[in-house]
Amino acid sequence: WKDHGELTVDLSKPTLVIAGDEAWRVDGLEDVPTIAEPSAPAPYVPVHPAAAAIFAKADAEVGDYYVRTKPAQVIVVGHPTLHRRVMGLITDPDIEVMVLSRTEDFLSLRDGNEARGTRVKTTGEPTREWLKVCEAASSLAVQAVRDVLDDDAHGFTGLHVAAAVTDTLAVGDTVFVGPSNAIRDVALTGLPFDGVDTYSPRGAAGIDGNISQAIGVAVAAQSLRADEIRAPRTVALLGDITFLHDVGGLLRGVDQPEPENLTIVVSNDDGGGIFESLEVGQPGLRRDFEQAFGTPHGVDIAAICAGYGIAYQRVESPQELLEALTSQAESPEPVVVIEAATTRATRRALHEAIASVVGG
């Protein structure tokens, strides 16, 4: 732990906190609107990450009036990485940026041209107008995501899987989220929130060992609450590539502690779904997309689970997944894999539909 000193922050200016991995609750910033990644503490004044597209604009039209939507300053806590629009706020030359860290490392997207510290001394307080702007922007983004999820034209996607997982979490549950689309999807569908501990591997090696980590998290959670009649619930959400990358983690040692209430949800879109919404997934660039980026594998996950002696269930719709998650919560298997057979064909259209509402 390293203390880099104190920064003075005038909260009467339109201020937005962006909290990433390794973030903590910063004294003095409790009442500031916050975009928080899933592994950050749940903020008191949450702002949906898709609202970042609204904050990127200088102002927005509301009836006969224009209101300022761009923050004057952004305070970065920890190391956010998940959303391009959010990162764009940090690099915006019109926004003053302060970065807080408790380690030797700082997130630096402006060649060091940002104020750096660990603690803050605040003056003023957020204005009612700014709080209303942030609430309205966040509500618009939340509704945009929910409207997309309700549109049958997109089929059953990884975002639907994430929504089912987050919607069925309860206070006291623990959730482990894999990298790539999984962690970004749960950020769009609700996480973080109080009462649910969230773990997610990050960085270049984020895909490594996810099943093993999820098992370890489940065992640790039940060890901490060993006096409870039923082991606390742990839910892991993994993409198919992430699941296959550590499939050997399903084999546990004979003398190792066993999970008693672990649900592993595999969002299986048969390949690299995250690339569908990136530049390489554009219609004009798809000639070799499946070979180079989509990389469909056609793996039989049911057969894998049978080989390792793991309980297995397959679902093909949001409703089936909700029912499976609810059933497992009520009568848990020690370890169960729920395979959600999803599509990635509508990924780009899905994100474009959200962007069309928030202006991204």
How would you describe each model-predicted region?
Residues T91-C134:
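Terminal amphipathic helices with adjacent charged low-complexity linkers/tails
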Residues I18-G20, V76-G78, L100-S101, G178, ...:
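Short beta-strand segments
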Residues S12, G190-G360:
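Thiamine diphosphate
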Residues D64-L89, W130-D151, E290-A303, I310:
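Extended, charge-rich low-complexity interaction segments
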Residues R25, E30, L82-V86, P126-E129, ...:
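General structural feature for long, well-ordered alpha-helical segments within catalytic domains
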Residues T15, A137-A231, V358:
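Active-site diphosphate/adenylate-binding microenvironment
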Residues W1-H4, L149:
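Flexible inter-domain linker/hinge segments
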Residues D3-V9, T15-M98, R102, F106-S108, ...:
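Glycine-rich, anion-gripping cofactor-binding loops and their flanking helix/strand elements
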